[in-house]
Regions:
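C-terminal glycine/acidic-rich active-site capping loop/insertion
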Residues: 121, 230-295
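N-terminal Rossmann-like dinucleotide-binding module
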Residues: 1-47, 62, 281
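C-terminal helix-rich "cap/oligomerization" subdomain common to oxidoreductases
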Residues: 66-69, 207, 278-310
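Contiguous beta-strand/loop segments that form the cofactor/metal-binding neighborhood of enzyme cores
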Residues: 167-244, 276-288
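Hydrophobic residues in well-ordered beta-strands that form the structural core
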Residues: 91-92, 116-118, 238
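A contiguous active-site-proximal alpha/beta segment in oxidoreductase catalytic domains
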Residues: 74, 96-154
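Mid-domain beta-loop-alpha active-site segment that forms a flexible
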Residues: 119-126, 152-183, 276, 296
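Beta-loop-alpha module in the N-terminal Rossmann-like domain of NAD(P)-dependent dehydrogenases
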Residues: 17, 47, 51-108
Length: 310
């Protein structure tokens, strides 16, 4: 069975999502909506058979199994609410800017028996799923500390760096450690030219007293996507920028305590967005959205709200 997809927003992220859905044998891009004629022409070039429009309401009552929303964050709530009345929805992160809106959308999805997905791409990566296994299996003893560095990204006008980059860190951490975290300290910076916070240092504590430091910044000469996990018996580096060796495990040498042994495990390096597409297909088939149950979206938003209000 092929699922019909409508994509709303074909600017920066919409084409990436569209490409991954079109690469699947189980989805077909039927509609692309965007307010830009240039973007619509690009979509028509990539998907000649799709219908294009500048009005998202034009696809109401069309046979659409999944609506993909990749627009400005402030518009997510309104568009998502409109479509959850009759079909399933995938929204680019962050879902909304308030937990109240997220809760309302989650309840609407339940009421109408529709599935609501959010594009937190890294929780579908082979690297994060490998990390989940070693944490659950207690492979290297107790996990004590995590340091995450996520720097350099296109500067956004609709949200600040916490809601842009920090949402990745919080989604990964909540996926790995559970939803509860306590905000300890936040330092935020705003350059004179930018009206929004562009750099943030975030200190959190998760259950079992796991201490977390996050640095998010748009302002960086190099792109950094690095998370360090400090276990009792090892330090694990997760470098999303490394094309092949995304996970490196360092353990102290038994013969020389000033040296480390390094192990590089075999990791699935399939593009996370394609794994997201596979997950959505399975969820639609089973009519169950397992990862996003138990308030996963809501708890991420609540944490981001706490950080923003600090």
């Amino acid at each position: 069975m092929k699922y019909n997809v409508a994509v709303i927003g074909y600017g920066y992220w919409g084409p990436k999502l569209s490409r991954n859905f079109s690469n699947s044998n189980n989805f077909e891009i039927k509609h692309v909506i965007d307010i830009s004629t240039i973007n619509l022409n690009k979509a028509k070039k990539n998907f000649p058979l799709c219908k294009i429009s500048k009005n998202y309401k034009s696809i109401f009552n069309q046979k659409v199994d999944l609506v993909v929303i990749s627009t400005t964050t402030i518009s997510h709530y309104k568009i998502c609410k409109f479509f959850l009345k009759y079909t399933n929805v995938l929204v680019e992160k962050p879902l909304c800017l308030t937990s109240k809106q997220v809760f309302e959308l989650e309840e609407l999805a339940k009421k109408n028996k529709k599935l609501l997905f959010v594009d937190y791409p890294f929780i579908f990566s082979g690297s994060v799923n490998y990390l989940s296994k070693i944490i659950k299996n207690n492979s290297f003893g107790k996990l004590n500390e995590i340091e995450s560095f996520r720097e350099q990204a296109p500067i956004r006008k609709d949200v600040n760096v916490i809601w842009d980059l920090g949402v990745h860190d919080i989604s990964i951490l909540n996926f790995l450690l559970g939803d509860y975290s306590n905000v300890v300290n936040i330092i935020k910076y705003k350059t004179k030219k930018l009206k929004k916070i562009d750099t943030a240092y975030i200190n959190l504590i998760y259950k079992n007293n796991i201490k977390v430091l996050i640095k998010n910044s748009w302002i960086s000469p190099i792109k950094i996507r690095l998370i360090k996990f400090k276990f009792e018996n090892a330090i694990v580096y997760y470098d999303e920028n490394d094309p092949l060796y995304k996970i490196k495990i360092y353990t102290l040498s038994k013969t020389n305590k000033s040296l480390f042994n390094i192990k590089i495990p075999e990791i699935d390096i399939t593009e996370p967005l394609f794994r997201l597409v596979e997950y959505i297909e399975k969820s639609l088939n089973k009519k169950r959205n397992k990862i996003f149950e138990n308030n996963f979206n809501l708890n991420i938003t609540k944490t981001l709200e706490k950080i923003s209000k600090w």
